[in-house]
């Protein structure tokens, strides 16, 4: 996507967006200055204008850490109603903004300085880009005259973030700030959501420099649209494609609704349920879509994929029609691609035309917003039914699915007296002891998969995780952001000991800001998922995966950071610890659950294998195969 030309150090960006999300032409200048008498025009510095623009966009909270190049923007925050959450590491600011966006649907905002601060937010930007999270990131930059001189804390932020943002821009004129901010929020939240970065040189926001003076204005919606002539996301499905999809659905004997995170981004959970019930079609929800369809619904099959349950994986594999809604046929779902759902025709709905046919060629591709397309599909199906078209007999398919569910439920071997604690047991007890609308935030690894498997997600926007990038260290800061966004909800971060050690310092942020998140560490003293692969595929050659159950002492570490620290080592201690944590609501709580390091995540489709080769728990017979 295009951006306005900057100094030669930052070359012009080529069009790369996954949904034609930006501008191929240089960004236009802002709207004409107000025609009111000059004495009544509001004169602001660039820093004041930036904060005022955020206020006008409805920003109530932002996450960040000040530094030299961004200091002029931090000064007007003192006089702003915007709440600023001071993080301990810039990566934490980005993940907090992600967590906030996940649970609210509003763009998360983070702000950091130049150089190493900007590079520290690259991981959250990439994470948000892969999971289509609306984010607006503001970075400081050295003065325009210093760009290209290797000045202190200078880096090519635009170049570095080009491939991990939906749009990025170096602002070179303070008069451009209001329009740039409006564009950023518009691009981040429309079409396929994603992160947008604004790089702000110090001299255009510093009130001590004449070059930062600007005359305040606020662009209208029409002016914003006119400034983005190449950006027109398609939201409604093509009528011909809608009709073809409806006809396929009415003919299918083994259909499955394959639901991805795009359904949640489109706020389409209610429409999805109406479609599933109208057509009596079973639903699988990917890792990014958990909660889009209630797990307690009779048509819910749960999560597919590498660690999905047997029924979800096998129903997709043996279907004759996959109705893919906001999903991208990720390799973790398809397994070996040429063996994936070999008899299935595909209807693929996505807001991003680049996703259609990227992995699996659909018989019916539909570009559009998932909610609008689902509503159009429902109407088209009703019209066909009114004309006398009936669904075929699917009783045999339903009986087959019921047989799989009965034969291959999620299971694990319970701990014998005196044995180590099972992580699945911890999650079951935690699930049953918390409100149904509890927000669960996971890191990456075994604990992430167990959380998605054993929690029952009956409400949308109650599951937050790093799906595409798989970012260790995501859970704690993202949970803090989620709690800021939904202070009325209980928020539990489920983390592994490896993940926790990467970003645990943000619990100091939570304690200082009185953000009472709760953290369950499933501490198996290993990098658990890596250990599992080494055991299963590398002849039990455990290379560099052992951590230690006692270094650090998580209970003492939590207390040192201003949290309540608890430790649980046996099954009979679990309920009391969870109850105590749930009763504390004035500061963060961390529970160190000492779990069995030998426990593995099942089911599992080995990497590179077709989904037919799914491995279930060995207790279910046939050696787990």
Question: Which stretches of residues belong to each language-model region?
Answer:
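Active-site diphosphate/adenylate-binding microenvironment
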Residues: 50, 65, 73, 399-477, ...
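Phosphate/pyrophosphate-binding active-site segments
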Residues: 42, 175, 224-228, 343-444, ...
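Conformationally flexible catalytic loops at phosphate/diphosphate-handling active centers
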Residues: 187-251, 410-412, 616
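Glycine-rich, acidic loop regions that bind phosphate or pyrophosphate groups
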Residues: 139-180, 200-202, 289-397
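Glycine-rich phosphate/diphosphate-binding loops that line cofactor/substrate pockets in enzymes
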Residues: 49-59, 100-105, 129, 187-192, ...
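A short, small-residue-rich loop immediately preceding and capping a beta-strand
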Residues: 60-64, 82-85, 103-142, 258-261, ...
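Thiamine diphosphate
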Residues: 138, 146-153, 313, 357-359, ...
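Glycine-rich, anion-gripping cofactor-binding loops and their flanking helix/strand elements
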Residues: 102, 261-347, 448, 458-488, ...
């Amino acid at each position: 996507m295009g951006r306005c030309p900057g100094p030669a150090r930052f070359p012009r960006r080529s069009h790369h967006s996954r949904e034609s999300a930006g501008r191929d032409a240089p960004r236009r200048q802002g709207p004409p200055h107000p025609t009111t008498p000059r004495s009544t025009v509001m004169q602001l510095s660039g820093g004041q204008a930036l904060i005022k623009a955020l206020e006008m966009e409805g920003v109530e909270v932002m996450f960040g850490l000040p530094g030299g190049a961004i200091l002029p923007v931090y000064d007007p925050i003192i006089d702003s109603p915007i709440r600023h959450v001071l993080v301990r590491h810039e990566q934490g600011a980005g993940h907090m903004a992600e967590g906030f966006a996940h649970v609210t649907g509003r763009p998360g905002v983070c702000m950091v300085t130049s150089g190493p601060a900007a590079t520290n937010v690259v991981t959250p930007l990439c994470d948000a880009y892969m999971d289509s999270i609306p984010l607006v990131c503001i970075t400081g930059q050295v003065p325009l005259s210093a760009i290209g001189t290797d000045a202190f804390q200078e880096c090519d932020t635009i170049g570095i973030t080009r491939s991990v943002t939906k749009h990025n821009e170096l602002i070179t004129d303070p008069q451009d700030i209001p329009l740039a901010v409006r564009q950023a929020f518009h691009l981040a939240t429309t079409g396929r959501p994603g992160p947008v970065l604004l790089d702000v040189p110090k001299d255009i926001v510093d009130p001590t420099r004449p070059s930062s003076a600007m005359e305040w204005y606020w662009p209208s919606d029409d002016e914003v649209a006119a400034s983005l002539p190449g950006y027109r996301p398609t939201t409604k499905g093509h009528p011909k494609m809608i009709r073809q999809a409806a006809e396929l659905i009415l003919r299918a004997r083994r259909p499955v609704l394959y639901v991805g995170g795009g359904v949640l981004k489109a706020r389409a959970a209610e429409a999805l349920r109406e479609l599933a019930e109208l057509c009596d079609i079973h639903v699988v929800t990917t890792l990014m879509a958990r909660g889009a369809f209630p797990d307690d619904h009779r048509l819910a099959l749960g999560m597919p994929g590498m660690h999905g349950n047997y029924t979800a994986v096998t129903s997709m594999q043996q279907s004759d029609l996959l109705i893919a809604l906001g999903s991208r046929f990720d390799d973790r779902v398809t397994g070996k691609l040429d063996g994936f759902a070999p008899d299935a025709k595909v209807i693929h709905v996505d807001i991003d035309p680049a996703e259609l046919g990227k992995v699996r060629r659909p018989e019916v591709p539909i570009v559009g917003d998932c909610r609008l397309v689902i509503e159009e599909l429902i109407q088209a199906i009703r019209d066909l039914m009114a004309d006398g078209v009936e669904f075929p007999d699917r009783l045999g398919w339903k009986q087959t699915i019921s047989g799989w569910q009965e034969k291959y439920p999620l299971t694990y071997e319970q701990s014998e007296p005196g044995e180590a604690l099972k992580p699945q047991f911890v999650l079951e007890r935690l699930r049953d002891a918390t409100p149904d609308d509890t927000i669960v935030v996971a890191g990456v690894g075994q604990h992430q998969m167990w959380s998605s498997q054993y929690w029952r997600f009956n409400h949308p926007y109650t599951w937050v995780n790093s799906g595409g990038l798989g970012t260790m260290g995501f859970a704690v800061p993202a949970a803090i952001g989620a709690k800021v966004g939904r202070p009325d909800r209980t928020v539990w971060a489920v983390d592994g000991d490896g993940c926790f050690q990467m970003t645990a310092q943000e619990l100091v942020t939570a304690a200082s800001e009185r953000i009472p998140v709760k953290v369950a560490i499933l501490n198996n003293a290993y990098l658990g998922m890596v250990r599992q692969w080494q055991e299963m595929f590398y002849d039990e050659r455990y290379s560099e995966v052992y951590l230690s159950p006692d270094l650090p002492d998580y209970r003492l570490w939590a207390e040192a950071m201003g949290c309540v620290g608890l430790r649980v080592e046996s099954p009979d201690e679990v309920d009391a610890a969870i109850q105590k944590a749930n009763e504390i609501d004035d500061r963060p709580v961390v529970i160190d659950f000492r779990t069995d390091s030998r426990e593995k995540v099942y089911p599992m489709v080995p990497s590179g294998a077709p989904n037919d080769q799914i491995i279930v728990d060995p207790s279910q017979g046939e050696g787990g195969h």
